[in-house]
Amino acid sequence: MEFSVKSGSPEKQRSACIVVGVFEPRRLSPIAEQLDKISGGYISSLLRRGDLEGKPGQMLLLHQVPNILSERVLLVGCGKERELGERQYKDIIKKTISTLNETGSMEAVCFLTELHVKGRDTYWKVRQAVESTKDSLYTFNQFKSNKPETRRPLRKLVFNVPTRRELNLGEKAIAHGLSIASGVKASKDLGNMPPNVANPAYLASQARRLADDYETVTTKIIGEEEMKKLGMTSYLAVGQGSHNESMMSIMEYKGHPDPTAKPIVLIGKGLTFDSGGISIKPSEGMDEMKYDMCGAASVFGAMKALAKLNLPLNVVGVLAGCENMPSSNSYRPGDILTTMSGQTVEVLNTDAEGRLVLCDALTYVERYEPECVVDVATLTGACVVALGHHISGLISNHNPLAHELINASEQSGDRAWRLPMAEEYNEQLSSPFADMGNIGGKAAGTITAGCFLSRFAKKYHWAHIDSAGTAWVSGANKGSTGRPVSLLVQFLLNRSGQENEE
């Protein structure tokens, strides 16, 4: 689909359809009022008749409105004007796209980007309209033998901005939105892939393909033989029960004017299937453990968006690919592992495996002398209990970095919430036989997991995002969400100084 921005009066638009808002109760938005005036009160007369109340998501398609050049006018219910917030705005955009496709419109001029959304500017409204549109059109049906035929005639969407001064800002918002949407789609596709296809080698192949597609990206793969030489015993232990080789895929993006500038490092947990190992999970819902690689998928998506945006940064993306399976060769509860850092870990539960993979990845990236490190993982069910399915958990050893990420989460709408990491929580990881256990009991499970990782991130500024509750949705519409790609890319945009410059 082609996106563009323009600034103009609604009555002068020659298009298949003009999209304008209506508030409750039957109140025309400023743009709709202009159309109503030109049409001699035609639209307001329909509202007085009760054809549209203005409730969120209500739609009314008008044909041949008097004195209007466009073929049709789509009235979109936006709820109460003062209550129009971010979530409702995105939902309205998605519903609008669905309706435009259902009505057969090939092009449309959308004035919803001129609505007032609390605390948001034109850049945000245009970018979110692009991201929401792309999200609403996403499908994953490549494994269906009979693919459903979906009617999608809409090919061109123009967003109107209030003044010509904002055209450049709108164009930048479209470019950013398309790049982020591309990264989100890549992340969703990886997450939704079945585990018999998306194994660690598949993650590696996608990382190589990214390097093939962009000159700014180089990729190297570390397999089990090299991991042994590096002393990544903890990482290797998790995957030793699977016939699929563990692979750590490293993508290096160099866009900074100084190629030696310290990089930002992103690490994603890539458990392509997590059965729990010897501490096996219940069978109900185990199919969703293919999503345990969504941390890696989000890092891959962020790297793809970064390459498309061509930001002036150096960034390293690490996909920590592995599979946790039960077998006669699996690691066991009671095993003591010596990590790459030299610290020892008593395995108390083989289903707390993500941290055992990440700890060696965190040690490995010390060689880059990073500006900062952010790891992303579907790490703990405790995070779902604490924050539900709407907000990711955040833990950090550096207040400014944590504030940057929280700010990026608010800007992008891909929200995170910082959890504490006090010394008292570290005491729960004590082991009588090793430097630490790999779990800290039932209490504060997300925090103790973060405390565990922090022991391997002492040489740089570090943050951990737990996306266990936000990386996918269950039920009839189950699937990967692509989160937190938007948060990560916003963080990188902010670091580059290009977040919403005109």
Curated annotation (Swiss-Prot):
* Cellular compartment(s): Cytoplasm
- Specify which residues bind Mn(2+) 2 according to the UniProt entry for this protein: K269, D274, D292, E353
Does the record's keyword annotation contain Transit peptide? no
Query: Does the keyword section mention Nucleotide-binding?
Result: no
Q: Which GO terms describe its biological process?
A: proteolysis
GO function terms (MF aspect) = manganese ion binding; metalloaminopeptidase activity
Reactions it catalyzes: Release of an N-terminal amino acid, Xaa-|-Yaa-, in which Xaa is preferably Leu, but may be other amino acids including Pro although not Arg or Lys, and Yaa may be Pro. Amino acid amides and methyl esters are also readily hydrolyzed, but rates on arylamides are exceedingly low; Release of an N-terminal amino acid, preferentially leucine, but not glutamic or aspartic acids
The free-text function statement in the UniProt record for this protein reads: Presumably involved in the processing and regular turnover of intracellular proteins. Catalyzes the removal of unsubstituted N-terminal amino acids from various peptides.
Cofactor field:
Mn(2+)
**Pfam families reported for this sequence:** Peptidase_M17, Peptidase_M17_N
Which domain of life, per UniProt? Bacteria
Query: Which residues bind Mn(2+) 1 per the record?
Result: D274, D351, E353
A Gene Ontology cellular-component term? cytoplasm
Organism, by scientific name, is Aliivibrio fischeri (strain MJ11)
Q: Which family does it belong to?
A: Belongs to the peptidase M17 family.
Q: What does the record say about how the cofactor binds? A: Binds 2 manganese ions per subunit.
Q: InterPro entries, per this entry? A: Leucine_aapep/pepB (IPR011356), Macro_dom-like (IPR043472), Peptidase_M17_C (IPR000819), Peptidase_M17_leu_NH2_pept (IPR023042), Peptidase_M17_N (IPR008283)
Q: Which HAMAP family match?
A: Cytosol_peptidase_M17
Which Enzyme Commission number(s) are on file for it?
3.4.11.1, 3.4.11.10
Q: What class of enzyme is it?
A: hydrolase
Q: Where is the active site?
A: K281, R355
This protein's name: Probable cytosol aminopeptidase
Q: Which UniProt keywords apply?
A: Aminopeptidase, Cytoplasm, Hydrolase, Manganese, Metal-binding, Protease
